[in-house]
Amino acid sequence: MTAMAAVFGILVALWLGAMIPGPSFVLVARNSIGLSRRDGLATALGMGAGGIVFGAVALGGLYTLLQTVEWLYVALKVAGGAYLLFMASKIWRGAAHPIAVADPLAARVGSTRKSFWMGLTTQLSNPKTAIWYASIFAALLPQHPPLWSYVVLPPLVFFVECGWYTIVALCFSTRRPREWYLRAKKWVDRAAAGAISALGLRLILTAPKTGI
């Protein structure tokens, strides 16, 4: 796998991870419905900023560690694949469960600055997000990535995270898209679970190989 393909794979995997309904998703949805569209967009910016932090840590820390402990590279691929399969099974089981969001009739004016920090702190305090980033970067990034990847990945990660949650904010601040997603949630979640399972199996099956 070339470095360019690895970067693209990381971005796709992070996009799929961002789409998984979790604390970040619910927070953006609640702020968009219960406060305002501006608060939802500010929360999305906070999620993107948190993605930059996770991306930078994954790039620097994992690369340095894998340089000195090569067997850990294989172990992380197996662990990452197992975690992705675990996450996929949870998503599949919870696909039929509705997402609890705030009552849109209880809307009030919020602070965009506060919403931004809520998004940032929620992103950074979620251990599942940290594990997700570590798994994806360790599994897909080459052991000796080119210098340009350190420059382009953080801003691209920001656009992936912020871009997805901006879509969430825009959708949940309007009635029809919100109702459509809530009706289709079961099938959307199961499609995401299938894609994540395929990625997890690939990581485990290719773990004995050196490089990606």
Where in this protein do the model-derived segments appear?
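Juxtamembrane transmembrane-helix termini in multi-pass membrane transport proteins
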Residues: T2-V74, S135-V157, T166, L170, ...
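Juxtamembrane cytosolic amphipathic helices that cap and anchor the N-termini
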Residues: A5, G110-S115, L124-P127
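Hydrophobic residues within alpha-helical transmembrane segments
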Residues: V12, L16, L41, L45-A49, ...
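Transmembrane helix irregularities
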Residues: M19-I20, L124-S125, G163
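Short, flexible, glycine-rich and Lys/Arg-enriched loop motifs at helix boundaries
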Residues: S173-R178
